């Protein structure tokens, strides 16, 4: 008989979001940061293109835009950090409460699974005892019949 863990048992299967999901969630929280990053990248690309064409004034303008976009991105990042800093502690508390609730639910499922398995084992033991008792009675009956038939033959 192989011993398997109950189906309610899981190891570290917390629904951890992958990297892309985390990035998407953070982008939803602070939409100005990715926007500023995209604008900065666009300004750098335009500056590189104008530099390649030899347009010095446009190149300087695009690099100035890049600095402005980087500053705006940094301000958005710091401002969002302050704003979401207090919310993060509340979110962390909520997450811990959810994890506690999930642990209680798993413990309950684990206990139910163990009780179910115990009931199955007890039922098997009872059937085994009943089968043994029935076999003993049949064997006893067979011996009695054999003894009676031997007694009749001797008479």
UniProtKB/Swiss-Prot annotation:
Its main location: mitochondrion. Residues 111-141 form a coiled coil. The chain crosses the membrane at residues 32-49, 62-84. Pfam families: HIG_1_N (PF04588). InterPro entries: Hypoxia_induced_domain (IPR007667), RCF1 (IPR050355). The keyword Coiled coil applies. GO terms for biological process: mitochondrial cytochrome c oxidase assembly; mitochondrial respirasome assembly; regulation of proton transport. Residues 4-95 form the HIG1 domain. It is found in: Mitochondrion membrane. It is a multi-pass membrane protein. The keyword Metal-binding does not apply. Keywords: Coiled coil, Membrane, Mitochondrion, Transmembrane, Transmembrane helix. One of its GO terms (cellular component) is respiratory chain complex. Cytochrome c oxidase subunit which plays a role in assembly of respiratory supercomplexes. Associates with the respiratory chain complex III/complex IV supercomplex. Belongs to the RCF1 family. This is Respiratory supercomplex factor 1, mitochondrial. It comes from Candida albicans (strain SC5314 / ATCC MYA-2876). The lineage of its organism: Eukaryota, Fungi, Dikarya, Ascomycota, Saccharomycotina. The gene is RCF1.
């Amino acid at each position: 008989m192989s011993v398997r863990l109950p189906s309610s048992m899981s190891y570290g299967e917390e629904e951890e979001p992958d990297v892309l999901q985390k990035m998407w969630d953070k982008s939803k929280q602070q939409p100005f940061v990715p926007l500023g990053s995209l604008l900065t990248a666009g300004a750098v690309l335009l500056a590189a293109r104008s530099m390649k064409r030899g347009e010095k004034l446009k190149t300087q303008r695009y690099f100035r835009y890049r600095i402005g976009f980087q500053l705006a991105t940094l301000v958005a990042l710091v401002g969002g950090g302050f704003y979401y800093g207090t919310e993060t502690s509340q979110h962390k508390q909520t997450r811990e409460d959810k994890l506690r609730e999930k642990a209680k639910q798993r413990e309950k499922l684990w206990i139910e699974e163990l009780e179910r398995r115990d009931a199955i084992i007890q039922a098997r033991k009872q059937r085994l005892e009943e089968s043994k008792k029935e076999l003993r009675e049949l064997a006893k009956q067979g011996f009695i019949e054999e003894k009676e038939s031997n007694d009749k033959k001797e008479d």
